[in-house]
Amino acid sequence: MSAWVLPDHIADVLPSEARHIEELRRGLLDTARGYGYELVMPPMLEYLESLLTGTGEALDLQTCKLIDQLTGRTMGLRADTTQQVARIDAHLLNRKGLTRLCYCGPVVHARPDRPRATREPLQFGAEIYGHQGMEADLEALHLALDCLRSAGVTNINVDLADVRIVRSLLAGVMVDMQVLRGVHAALAAKDASELERLTRDFPAASREGLMALLQLYGGIEVLDRAEKLLARTAGVQPLLDQLRWLAQRLEGVSVSFDLADLRGYAYYSGTRFAIYVPGASDALVRGGRYDEVGAVFGRNRPAAGFSLDIKQLVAVVPERPLKAAIRAPWGDDPQVAAAIAALRRQGETVVCVLPGHESEVDEFHCDRELVQVAGQWAVQAI
């Protein structure tokens, strides 16, 4: 095998794309800061006990593991940053009241989570801790939308659901975990025949409600239909009211619902949203409420947030034009060095042409050059 071959679904990021990614990263962090979110930087490596405690089987399977050469203990490369941020909120900050945190950094997946996906996403996310009300869910959703808009994303669709609806339908149903997994899989695949087989011995209200979920997707009318079809299930009406409340406060986007969407079922504790845009094969942003995320760290308090992969985002956002640069001669002349330094302090990109490379071009388009006129260095159009 050639020495330069990289692992499957791992790739170098070349200058043009790297510049675009970095511009998006800065814009996303600036947008989060505008909402009052503070940046944190968790480590890439942690012991598995803290990295995976309370996260479920799916994240465990996605985590690349290795042995710490100093202690002999098993460590993991993070596959998701949310649990680490919850640990920071619970133990290191331990603030009373609201805490708003954001992050941006690479994660590593043992397997790609979708076709043609990278196994090294650049994950950006934001979390708000300490508020139980729907205002926190709405703020997280508004921030996610503003992040996409600041990146130049248009034609946005927000898909809403609530995992508590399925939990309400399954309340009191006595079945083993394998059957429950099958029910979840059948709902996710909208497999009516399999769901009917698995729920044959369920109470009538649960069975009929679960079967009804397969048809409860679409626009706002879905909530009206759900109110009728799920009327026999206690606790569902307030959840539908909360989804309607959220939808009514989203402007400039299309809103849909899929009440059988169980992505992140073991992780989310309430409302859940996914944001889709043209050109992306999967949701660009996923988020919602996950109140139990900090429980394993001894501080079980309300939490809502979202995350996205900037490498996925860059594929659907038009690249911004590169600011034209200034070409300058290389030399030991203190005057030209001072002129170049002054231009760079003003925010200009100045590319020095090294001897013998005058005819070469690079990514930076130069529309001006630094020339000597009457003994003074000045910028002129090329």
From Swiss-Prot:
UniProt keyword terms in alphabetical order: Amino-acid biosynthesis, Cytoplasm, Histidine biosynthesis
Membrane-crossing segments per the record: none
Signal peptide positions on this chain: none
Compartments, record wording: Cytoplasm
This protein's GO CC annotations: cytoplasm
CDD domains in the cross-refs: HisRS-like_core
Cited InterPro entries: aa-tRNA-synth_II/BPL/LPL, HisRS-like_core, HisRS/HisZ, HisZ
GO biological process: histidyl-tRNA aminoacylation; L-histidine biosynthetic process
Pathway(s) served: Amino-acid biosynthesis; L-histidine biosynthesis; L-histidine from 5-phospho-alpha-D-ribose 1-diphosphate: step 1/9
Top-level taxon of the source organism: Bacteria
GO molecular function: histidine-tRNA ligase activity
Main location per the UniProt record: cytoplasm
Comment field (misc): This function is generally fulfilled by the C-terminal part of HisG, which is missing in some bacteria such as this one.
Subunit structure: Heteromultimer composed of HisG and HisZ subunits.
NCBIfam families reported in the protein's UniProt record: hisZ_biosyn_reg, PRK12292.1-1, PRK12421.1
Similarity comment: family membership: Belongs to the class-II aminoacyl-tRNA synthetase family. HisZ subfamily.
Biological function: Required for the first step of histidine biosynthesis. May allow the feedback regulation of ATP phosphoribosyltransferase activity by histidine.
Protein name (record): ATP phosphoribosyltransferase regulatory subunit
